[in-house]
Amino acid sequence: MFVVKYYRMGILDIKMRWYVARREKYANYDLRFEGVTVERNIRYGERKGQVFSLYRKSKKRLPVFVYFHGGALAGRTKGARRAFCAEIAKLGVAVLNVEYKGEVMLGAKECLEECEKILAYLKERSTTLGIDIDRLIFGGDELGAYVASYLATKAENYGIRPVGVVLFSGYYDAIRHAKENSYFESQYQFIKKFYKIDLRRASFDNSVSTYLKSMSVTSMVTEDFPSTFICYSANDEFLPEQSGAMIKAIKQKDVYLWEFKAVDKVVYHNFHLDRRTKESQVVMEYLSAFIKEAVDGGVYSNEYREI
């Protein structure tokens, strides 16, 4: 019975990877920048991979959207989000498409500490970059949503108060993820590489639970967390419980929340990347409204949509 369970999990894991690979394939299918200029590989830290690309339509001082891609442990880079970042830049905001893939391999704590360097960099270089950090939004998908959420809780230490956070198909609750998903080979490897915990050899004792809880952004959300846009699928094949955990944490602190839930059975993880679909197009319309409202004075309302 035990072997059969792992065999079935392995087959499902392969299917999940294939679905995600298809969506990644179409993420940049419509790569038209239409007046958006791109300055590539601007360094924000000393490590080799600590760079970002800057997308903008105008040279004047602009609000800024700082985005972290997903799939870093699977080898994906910021290049996989070029079309998405260019589209956001068309709204009249500067977009930083941040690379952090190398930092992920250091482990969770070290990765987050290294990613914090972007905060110090933005505080120091905002004038040079032509961005308004008083109108800053963090965003990300998958593990990038985890990084974006974490930085939103640390930004005030650098004199930055984000006006919004945008999260897609994200990862937020480490302890819940480890308990519920380590049977999947890809998720077991993620936990092993990122948290340096081998759950097939180590017991889930108090020290492991305490550590994972301390690394969960759901436990870091306070009343001062920025207004949040969160998008996910009810049929997410990779992280089915994660968005619900983050939404619960946000609601408990009375943070303004725009929640978008895809309910169609054939709409899966990171569906926003495939711009051919109506669900992705609808989400992008609402995201445009959220960004404009956030940078024009702040989001002070709650929204819920099933799409």
Predicted regions and their residues:
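Alpha/beta-hydrolase superfamily serine-hydrolase fold, recognizing
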Residues: 1-307
